[in-house]
Amino acid sequence: MKKRNLMVALLCSMCLAVSSPVPAMADGTKVVTLGADLTQDQKNTMMNYFKADSSQVQVITVTNQDERDLLGNYVPSEQIGTRTLSCAYVKPTQSGGIKVRTANLNYVTCNMIATALSTAGVNNCEVVAACPYEVSGTGALTG
């Protein structure tokens, strides 16, 4: 199982590195990705959970089509599902490597997210990937 997760993480990160549909984060820019299928109340809950102010972060909406475009060849369709709900908060740092923590994700792991960021050239950041309730986390990985 660990070998399979590592393989999925590597494949996802390669896919993300070459075909990301969302703007790349500039050095020092904090980014929040929100699942397109969250209600406004759920989006507000996630922004509060991340302690992020929408006027001070770049907010990107991730759709189920984004997930399918980026992960469809590597992640089982039943893990991607039909709605995008998970979110991520990325805060660039000056040192310390890539630190990831998750909440309510049952498929995507911290290692998958860290590998995708590393492959995309990110060296130092803090990431929180989460959802208001348990989901696979492919939306957060896509973001």
Describe these PLM feature segments.
Residues 1-2:
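N-terminal secretory signal peptides that target proteins for export/translocation
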